[in-house]
């Protein structure tokens, strides 16, 4: 670049270049027929490099440089895409007083295929209906473990690159792992949680501590709201109904009792008591519990810090191992927790082994004595509200997680790509409420969850590399993003095709929101056949259909299809980027370009073919005409 001497604005320097080198149409012609910029920009263009030998560079760099183009191609090459294509390389010029620039734009199309046809471990049994509830809860259990388990990044690799498949050079370990997760049959127990694993693996030391803490908080809350389900006190519920006196006199096991607030820092005791990792055995012990209640617990925990459940959820989800003293020092316990919430959260964060980068906001002033008296009266009423304590616990945990997410770096903070699971749990909750959990919806739920996790992981990767890298986004802009999903049968024929489009710099994050909502809503249509006329409009509203998002008939075909026919799903990610074209100020490069353009124009006028790049063609002579003006401060050149 130092030798190239890049120039962006050529407003008062146009006469230094050949006419074809300064206009969008001229650069398009040069890029396509002379230099082949779509490939040349990927070469080493240092003076004298092998790529610059002979026609048309003659040991000089190219007269233009497409800023960001090489990084775009490298970003796509570093991922697990099976195919990559770059088309519609175009140039546009912007001319206004004092400003004349040229931009390049390209459409990238990258795709890969995932094997979704293997459901044997999940749902293929001789008597499926007899084991439906067990299968459903087993699937939920494995998924919840993937959501809440304290996942650690990969360790133990002495090198970060390993030998790939036949014919490949060494590839990053992360790429091999992502390729491994493309097959639902092969990855088996590791089918779930791919997006979370990759998020942890890409985190820095500070982010790793924060993400692990957030995961512990969600795990603790999930264990808290399910503790009443596995509580030993539940074993004697039948006896309590028959003999209330015996129930009141029977003490609860001491190891399951924890009084709150035991001190001001109740959060530490809460996390210490409940943050044991969620494992399959714990979830399987809940099989006697209605699936609908289990799903409510899952949604409440996974959706943290967003989406406070309705009040009736707290009546159904009660922590069973906390003994709540109704009053402490004349004040309601729940109100005490609410008053001290900010202080407890700040102390918890300050104890973490990370340096905080956000200035602490001073706490609000204490309430006057008159207000305290009024609040005490309100507390007595508030304590009677069923579920108030559970609601306060969730509110505190949610606020703590929200503050921890603000401490994350920008790359680790973008959690919108990892919230897709909530849509699928809510779809399962609706099916459970309707009593419509059968083989077909469960098959579709598994397949679409697996596909959505792949889409979320890929969109997050593209977002981090193309939209969240400041050096790149300072120059290159994302204009359009599109995801195409093609379901194929065992012989490769397309069963249905779906398209989602979004525009702007936030296109990737908007896409995952639309896709997860769309596919989760389609789960409920599994096994119902074709939609009736009166159902189509409602279904389109549920999936938030937008114009230019694919054929409506394809959407209806997807809803009605039998998912056992689908063997694989091809995912195509298309995105259009626009970046700047830099011009050279080096006189030697300009002279070579002037000679090459004049010679190519002469050959074209004579209807002759242009030489291929690297052809052994002597350097053409300088075309006749007036000497181009010198750049400011340049010395006159003597010709011999």
Curated annotation (Swiss-Prot):
The answer, when asked if Transmembrane is one of the entry's keywords, is no
What UniProt keywords are attached to this protein's entry? Covalent protein-DNA linkage, DNA replication, DNA-binding, Host nucleus, Phosphoprotein, Viral DNA replication
Give yes or no: UniProt keyword DNA-binding.
yes
Q: Where is this region: Disordered?
A: 232-257, 614-640
Q: Which residues carry this modification: O-(5'-phospho-DNA)-serine?
A: 549
GO CC list: host cell nuclear matrix
The residue numbers the entry assigns to motif Nuclear localization signal are 351-360
Site, as annotated: Priming of strand displacement replication by covalently linking the first nucleotide of the new DNA chain: 549
Protein known as:
Preterminal protein
Which organism does this sequence originate in?
Answer: Human adenovirus B serotype 7
What lineage is this protein's organism placed in? Viruses, Varidnaviria, Bamfordvirae, Preplasmiviricota, Tectiliviricetes
Recorded name of the encoding gene: PTP
